Each structure stands twice: as structure tokens, then as C-alpha cells.
């Protein structure tokens, strides 16, 4: 930011790996965990890094935008889908970053459809603190999984009707 004319800093892979049970951070956790659960400690590690970067970027060039591409599902929602979530699986607390003003925009990777898309994109908007939320749509799934064009068009319509700031492809 100090040496280049940039418009933004984007964190694409700002998370722990999905093989969290095998991630080699036992020693660091013992030294620095301070009574927190490992999940909370990991979330805090990422959040501290994001916060330091955001604060430094804004100190140097307040107009530069800071964003990330978290997993498409922020958190588990009652009765809706299972599997990976940003908050519980890879320790991205992007909702917190938005609520505390440490992110200007989110581009969640929403490569799902139907019940795994609609409630989760609405949850991102709710977590977004009126900041920019632009879901990445899984148009590649038309080839890889045989999604129809209508699947994507329905997602575009939904985002337009629910205060979403656009779509990313």
C-alpha cells in the first residue's frame, strides 16, 4: 500500500485448512491459547491479523478497500444443510470483521444452489453491517455438475431482491 498505487487488498485464502485436526499448531496453542478453546484461539489469530492489516492500510491510504472471499456458508443455520462453514470449520469470522468495521467488502464463495444458497446469502447480508456483500456464484457448476442456466438466473434474481450488492463470477 505504501509502495504501489492499489485500490484494494483482497484476502482470498484467509483461513485454516480444512484438515484442521492435523494442522500442526499444538505447540503454539499450548503457549498462546490462554484458556481459550482451540477454535476460538484460531478465529482470534485470523481476526487479529485481519485487524492489523485493515488498520495499517487505512492509516496509510484510507480509500483503499479491504476485502476477502470467505467460504459460502458463514455459520451453521438451524435445519439447513451441513458441512463446511467459515466460522466453525476454517475459523473465518468474517461476520465479526464486517460488524466491527475491519472489512469493507465480502465476496463469499457461494458455489451452492437452492437450500444451500438462499438462506446463506441472506445470512451474509444480515452479518454485513450494511457493507458490501457480493456473493461469488458457481457458474462453473453448469459444466461440472450440470446446473441449469435457470439455477444461476434464480440466484441473480434473489440477490437483486434481497439488498445484495451484486454478484461475482
Question: Could you say what each language-model-derived stretch is?
Answer:
Residues 5, 30, 55, 112-113, ...:
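Compositionally biased, intrinsically disordered low-complexity regions enriched in proline and serine
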Residues 34-41, 111-120, 128-131:
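Generic structural signal for short, solvent-exposed loop/turn connectors between secondary structure elements
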Residues 94-117, 131-169:
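Substrate-binding cleft of secreted/luminal carbohydrate-active enzymes
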Residues 5, 62, 129-131, 163-164:
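Short glycine/proline-enriched coil/turn segments at helix->beta-strand junctions
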Residues 37, 125-128, 160-163:
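Generic secondary-structure transition motif, activating predominantly at the C-termini of alpha-helices
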Residues 1-103:
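Polysaccharide-binding and catalytic clefts of secreted carbohydrate-active enzymes
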Residues 33, 63-82, 121-155:
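Active-site clefts of carbohydrate-active enzymes
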Amino acid at each position: 500500500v505504501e509502495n504501489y498505487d492499489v485500490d484494494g487488498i483482497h484476502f482470498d485464502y484467509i483461513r485454516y485448512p480444512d484438515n484442521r485436526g492435523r494442522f500442526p499448531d499444538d505447540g503454539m496453542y499450548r503457549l498462546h491459547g490462554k484458556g481459550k478453546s482451540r477454535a476460538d484461539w484460531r478465529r482470534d489469530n485470523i481476526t487479529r491479523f485481519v485487524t492489523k492489516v485493515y488498520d495499517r492500510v487505512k492509516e496509510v491510504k484510507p480509500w483503499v478497500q479491504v476485502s476477502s472471499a470467505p467460504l459460502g456458508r458463514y455459520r451453521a443455520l438451524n435445519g439447513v444443510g451441513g458441512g463446511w462453514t467459515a466460522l466453525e470449520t476454517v475459523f473465518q469470522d468474517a461476520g465479526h470483521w464486517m460488524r466491527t468495521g475491519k472489512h469493507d467488502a465480502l465476496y463469499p464463495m457461494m458455489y451452492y444452489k437452492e437450500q444451500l444458497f438462499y438462506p446463506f446469502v441472506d445470512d451474509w447480508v444480515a452479518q454485513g453491517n450494511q457493507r458490501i456483500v457480493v456473493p461469488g456464484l458457481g457458474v462453473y457448476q453448469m459444466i461440472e455438475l450440470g446446473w441449469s442456466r435457470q439455477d444461476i438466473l434464480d440466484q441473480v434474481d434473489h440477490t437483486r431482491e434481497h439488498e445484495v450488492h451484486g454478484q461475482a463470477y
